[in-house]
Amino acid sequence: MHLSSAQDAQGHTPGTPHDEQFALAAELLALLGDRTRLALLHALTCGEADVTTLTEACGAARPAVSQHLARLRLAGLVTTRKEGRRVVYALRDGHLRRLVDEALNVADHRLSGRPVHD
């Protein structure tokens, strides 16, 4: 099979997202679409935190926070480590931190009426 120079071995044009990327991005955005999960991720943009700290930060009930954190962990968005009897959570990477920050910036611009920008 002959591939044009504008496509890779899988037939994708470089720089153009393919179906798997769109599907995974949609799953990620769906997880961010929940107010409590978004608040938890935002709290983690400041650094590591345990369930008690995260519960206080987002204002949800502790069982709900634990369930949301479990979903985020299973999705690979947060990491955990043990510190004595406590479990400490952290964002997996800076991409997620920037995505959360940008989502909140868009919301802030819409609520404040400030002009959009690049």
Please place each PLM-identified region on the residue numbering.
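Residue-level detector of secondary-structure transition/capping positions
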Residues: 48-49, 73, 104
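Residues in the helix-turn-helix
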Residues: 64
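Beta-hairpin "wing" of winged helix-turn-helix
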Residues: 73-83, 90
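Alpha-helical and His/Cys-centered functional microenvironments
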Residues: 6, 71-72
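Residues within the DNA-recognition helix of helix-turn-helix
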Residues: 68
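N-terminal helix-turn-helix DNA-binding core of bacterial DNA-binding proteins
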Residues: 20-61, 87-95
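Amphipathic alpha-helical dimerization/coiled-coil segments
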Residues: 1-24, 42, 93-118
